[in-house]
């Protein structure tokens, strides 16, 4: 499923003078199937408003432009939001705050029961088991526990399982790594890559963490004041000083280091992933710290 | 969900805003008593109450529309009570279909009474910040300290509750979105189904409230909060000439209404006497 937004606009409280706020301003973007797409920008730049359009949590306003997700036309009044939401999974910040059921099993099965009314009990059990093992939890060990008795990291895993259990084709993550310790973060990002390989086709990540974007995203869009000011690969975006200045974002560590080492004539360039950067640096060091 | 205008503070520097919160609460209570004192069908009393609210609104510099907005939240309740009066009142003579003249008067009476009370109450919260309001209530409840009632703690609980309303609204919004993304449906089905659909929202909300309460308690502890004993105030409440004027005006209102009531009562007595 492709996400295509054309001249998408959105204004909060459009009728109240003084309170109305234009959150999206002529947003044009195309997110292809199979991408890990980053959405970056400062707080209040319209990122969250945009991603909440993708599964119809925020509806396209009258005259607000066009938005298509796969075959779903979100400007159509008869759009079937429920089946759309089954195909577009969304995880908010601190997803563990959405847990509510008495057992982990019930909580993970929640989305499944909502989306497919006539699903059999065996199938539910099989799907929950699959989802829990995908996020790295032992089904037999946790299924009857209360989700509130788990550790923070485990809670978040259960919450993710509760989203991916519906087998969405697109997974939207809003600040997925917020509040995790470095180890938890690493494990979580590895989980994301695993998910992308054999579970969901497209992942859309909203994040402030430029290191994460540089490392994992195939492409990204930069939001600023409700507009998209740039779209491209992380390499393209972080090489352009204009964009960085306009959006008020930080450079990822690898980009900043590449910049410094380039000015000293130690390396020529890198694509800003940790692997590529260290490789280039090692080659440079083997050559006595000079460009070959 | 965000436009909860009932009970929102409108900052200004007016005469009413500068009044002592204790006096304002007392005046508001006295005003409500006055509204209730207006006896059946004597709309002149309501006119006096309306005049009082309009006067107070003008002096407080709060826009009229802002005060009227507060009525919007209870309009359903008002209309419902009026309809009950219209259709289920059997007294008096029939004017139209099942509607009687007494029913009509009663409906008008109920509408006037509820509207006037809500207008007065919202004017109090529009001109008094939640903190002042809590301070005012604490001040008024002070005599209860004699029977060891924890007045300060009570006021603190109230101001915390008020402070957390917007936070909880935001939180509810977020949780509803998260559950909607998992296919939860709050808009279809009968009332029982809808009530059941709220469980996935209410439980996380309850849990997050406990978490917030814990965090707030820690934050207060780390700032050495120790209750009423050692606490001093930055803004002391003081009874001034403004409050005296307010009290006099509302006292005038009550006296006027009582007088009107007495006048009407005497009149009807005279009528009865004349008929005899």
What residue ranges belong to the model's regions?
Chain A
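The feature captures the beta-strand-to-loop junction immediately N-terminal to the Walker
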Residues: 40-42
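Helix-to-loop junction immediately C-terminal to a conserved catalytic motif
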Residues: 55
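ABC ATPase NBD Q-loop/coupling interface
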Residues: 66-83
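Conserved ABC ATPase signature
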Residues: 146-150, 154
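Conserved catalytic motifs of ABC-family nucleotide-binding domains
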Residues: 167
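Catalytic Walker B motif of ABC-type/P-loop ATPase nucleotide-binding domains
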Residues: 171-174
């Amino acid at each position: 499923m492709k996400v295509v937004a054309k001249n998408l606009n959105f204004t909060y409280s459009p009728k109240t003078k003084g309170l109305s706020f234009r959150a999206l301003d002529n947003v044009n973007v195309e997110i292809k199937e199979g991408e890990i797409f980053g959405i970056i920008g400062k707080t209040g730049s319209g990122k969250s408003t945009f991603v909440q359009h993708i599964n119809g949590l925020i509806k396209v306003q009258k005259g607000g432009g066009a938005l298509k997700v796969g075959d779903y036309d979100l400007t159509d009044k008869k759009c079937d939001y429920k089946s759309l939401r089954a195909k577009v999974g969304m995880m908010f910040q601190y997803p563990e705050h959405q847990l509510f059921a008495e057992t982990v099993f019930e909580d993970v099965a929640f989305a499944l029961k909502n989306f497919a009314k006539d699903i059999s009990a065996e199938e539910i059990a099989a799907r929950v088991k699959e989802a829990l093992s995908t996020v790295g939890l032992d089904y037999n060990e946790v299924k009857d526990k209360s989700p509130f008795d788990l550790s923070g990291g485990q809670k978040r895993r259960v919450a993710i399982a509760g989203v991916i259990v519906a087998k969405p084709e697109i997974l939207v993550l809003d600040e997925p790594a917020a509040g995790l310790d470095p180890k938890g973060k690493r494990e979580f990002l590895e989980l994301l890559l695993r998910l992308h390989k054999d579970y969901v086709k497209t992942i859309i990540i909203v994040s402030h963490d430029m290191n994460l974007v540089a490392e994992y995203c195939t492409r990204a869009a930069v939001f600023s004041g409700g507009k998209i000011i740039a779209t491209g690969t992380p390499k393209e975006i972080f090489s352009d000083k204009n964009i960085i200045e306009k959006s008020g974002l930080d450079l990822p560590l690898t980009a900043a280091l590449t910049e410094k080492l380039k000015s000293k004539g130690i390396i020529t360039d890198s694509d800003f992933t940790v692997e590529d950067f260290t490789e280039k640096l090692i080659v440079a060091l083997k050559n006595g710290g000079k460009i070959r | 969900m965000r436009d909860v205008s009932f009970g929102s503070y409108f900052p200004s520097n007016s005469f009413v805003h500068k009044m002592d919160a204790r006096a304002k609460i007392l005046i508001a209570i006295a005003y409500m008593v006055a509204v209730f004192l207006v006896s059946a069908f004597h709309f002149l009393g309501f006119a006096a109450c309306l005049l009082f609210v309009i006067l107070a609104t003008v002096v407080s510099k709060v826009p009229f529309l802002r005060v009227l907005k507060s009525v919007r939240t209870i309009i359903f309740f008002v209309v419902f009570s009026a309809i009950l009066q219209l259709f289920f009142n059997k007294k008096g003579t029939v004017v139209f279909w099942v509607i009687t003249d007494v029913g009509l008067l009663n409906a008008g009476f109920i509408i006037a009474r509820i509207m006037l009370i809500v207008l007065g109450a919202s004017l109090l919260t529009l001109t008094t910040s939640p903190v002042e309001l809590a301070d005012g209530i604490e001040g008024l409840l002070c005599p209860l300290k004699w029977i060891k009632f924890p007045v300060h703690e009570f006021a603190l609980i109230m101001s915390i509750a008020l402070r957390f309303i917007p936070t909880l609204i935001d939180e509810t919004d977020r949780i509803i979105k998260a559950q909607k993304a998992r296919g939860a449906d709050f808009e279809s089905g009968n009332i029982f189904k809808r009530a059941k659909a709220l469980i996935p929202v209410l439980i996380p909300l309850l849990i997050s409230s406990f978490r917030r309460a814990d965090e707030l308690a820690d934050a207060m502890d780390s700032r050495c909060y120790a209750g009423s004993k050692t606490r001093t105030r930055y803004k002391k409440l003081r009874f001034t000439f403004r409050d005296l004027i307010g009290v006099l005006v509302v006292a005038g209102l009550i006296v006027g209404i009582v007088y009107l009531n007495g006048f009407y009562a005497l009149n009807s007595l005279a009528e009865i006497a004349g008929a005899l």
